[in-house]
């Protein structure tokens, strides 16, 4: 269950409000899940006409105002809209946009990147730090950097450098390939290039030599061995580098990435190792090159108190380094600025109990006080906020191909001569009511198991087993209809909603497009992008195209807990049913894999214009020919193999000439097409 923070707070706004706490209108904190009971998803019964479903109901159900503000909302037509510039105006109907893109031969699944959202996120982050600096009279500046590892796509990095230029926004590289990207693209005067990750001689020399190009690379020492490497390279090249040290804080993070700190963290120097590095640099006459202190307490920090504790410890280390003679100028607070994926504004791992302004305020205030106490000049502040910048700009659109439902028809009464177990199930079904539903659920389950046992012994015929199972599902549906009207139900019936859920088969690979859903149970907001003026009467889970039982999504955002099913509309064959996965712009694309050889999806970059929008870039998804080449197949050789087999089959009269030509043509065309299904 979610462990709620002690504070509720408002969503971020362009004004970057100083308000920290926002209590619900009733004055009460949100209640967590009862240890013994859980509230099920409410639904109107088919005969319930007491109220009409409204747009506001969909807004509340999918929590779009919680996680989507100020970019996503629902319009009067029941479609999701996107406001790429936030509350500064201009919006697009996402459903209409998808249809327009499909008419341009951009098939689903489709990744839509909104360049204006990326720009708005950079503006907001810089505005928050500017406001904090002004509020606390901080005599320093903020210089953000974007960690390239969050999303290495060329068009995104190019946009980020362009949008960040007014703020001297820089880049952070965590590997040699990322360093190559950053060196080639970052041309903003005064911006910083933070060089993290494991380093060899080539990495260090390349970073140092880039100083000659007018760039400001800061080589962050993360392993003790790197100190000697940097000293040797500096002496050989005759270049005095700008150095930093990454400290392993004792402050413990929280959530999935909480182990990024501490003595056994993967990266960084312990306090004794930092002293060792300082002594070595002093002996090499390079102590004045040590100008930056860096720490990272993990990605997606959900609780503001963790940030408060970390900056308190880090600021003390910073002033001590300055007192040891280092030429300290920069403090890099790393990443961790969270994204509210579930809209609950709590310290749950998929949320955060603070906003961007709270984050900036606490960093600036603590650092100013510590430096003033020790009479040390304040540093230039740096953050590596990748997730908070990149997540919102990307929306993954996919369609539903079909559904699989448990039988919901009214069951037939038993016929004379049928197995007694069928009569027992029928009597159970007839007798279920609000008083006995729990007891009769046990009975129905027992009778179903008995029917399977009789079938395995050869006593029950196949048709009888089918009838028994239909009666069992009818009992479950009747019980579910009852408990949906209750506030809470017993633990043993909690899974009934999921047991009765439909399976919605989606045109998507979870492993390719949302690997964190599979790998670490990450929650992303998922919802239909149209029909939101209709009540979603179905409950479902999502199953992808891969031949893998893990290729599914059965965990969804909720205010009080994680839902095991998602409210969906009845699927209408022949009619499109589009769904969107939101806030997935960080890490997912680069971490996606080729399971079952489903490749990269189509991607399009959209920018708002006074008259609507323009398509800046189209990045076509992988074709079948491309994905097979990744595993060392040559498509021309494959076509030739099929051609030769067709010729042999013709010779042996196992295929007609027309059939062979049709097969060959289809085979060649398929290799040139998208790896996903035509919708």
UniProtKB/Swiss-Prot annotation:
Modified residues annotated as N6-(pyridoxal phosphate)lysine in this record: 149
Catalytic reaction list: L-arginine + H(+) = agmatine + CO2
GO molecular function terms listed in the Swiss-Prot or TrEMBL record: arginine decarboxylase activity; metal ion binding
Top-level lineage group: Bacteria
GO biological process entries: arginine catabolic process; spermidine biosynthetic process
Cofactor(s) recorded in Swiss-Prot or TrEMBL: Mg(2+); pyridoxal 5'-phosphate
Binding sites annotated in the UniProt record for substrate: 331-341
InterPro entries (alphabetical): Ala_racemase/Decarboxylase_C (IPR009006), Arg_decarb_HB (IPR040634), Arg_decarbox_C (IPR041128), Arg_decrbxlase (IPR002985), De-COase2_CS (IPR022657), De-COase2_N (IPR022644), De-COase2_pyr-phos_BS (IPR022653), Orn/DAP/Arg_de-COase (IPR000183)
E.C. number(s) listed in UniProt: 4.1.1.19
Keywords in alphabetical order: Decarboxylase, Lyase, Magnesium, Metal-binding, Polyamine biosynthesis, Pyridoxal phosphate, Spermidine biosynthesis
Region annotation Disordered: where it falls in the sequence: 1-43
CDD domains documented for this protein: PLPDE_III_ADC (cd06830)
Enzyme kind, highest EC tier: lyase
Family: Belongs to the Orn/Lys/Arg decarboxylase class-II family. SpeA subfamily.
Physiological role: Catalyzes the biosynthesis of agmatine from arginine.
Protein name in UniProt: Biosynthetic arginine decarboxylase
Source organism (scientific name): Nostoc sp. (strain PCC 7120 / SAG 25.82 / UTEX 2576)
